Amino acid sequence: MKEKWINALTLAFTVALLPPIWAVLSPYIGVTVGAVALICAGLFACLNNDIKMAVPVSLGFLCGDIWAVIATNVMVASNLGANVTVYLTLFIMGGLAVVIGTLLDKLVFIPAWLAGWAIGLTIMGPMDVTNLGTTPFQIGAAMLAGVWYVGVVGDLFQKLLIKIIKK
């Protein structure tokens, strides 16, 4: 079998097997935003599931999650008009994320921070800020599941399958 098809079919099997397990089990551990894992796994896959990047990507996603909570609270507290508030919040916090991320570039992957922020805002933005409850923690758990379970474990599983097939 050609290398291309070995990679494609083992990846197809890995994608068919592992993410659905997360999708089924995540609500049982209190995570109602399980699909976030797939988004985060997709970004991690763009880095070739490089395990050396797993920690900076994870920290970036978690920074984005925290950033979304802060932004949501800032936007609710603002007396400015909705459009001005959204613009200024995104302008200031986006710029700060890049500057802080650059200072911490060995620890935090900036694109993950920005993507995590967007994910968090998409989920929490429409919510009543007083009812966020465990939502930020659920988002963070799903982000980590995307990187570590779907990304790292998935990559190791696929490599194992390839090794078995090539024997």
Please identify what each model-predicted range represents.
Residues A16, V31-N48, G94-G95, T102-N131:
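Pore- and pathway-forming membrane helices of multi-pass small-molecule/ion transporters and channels
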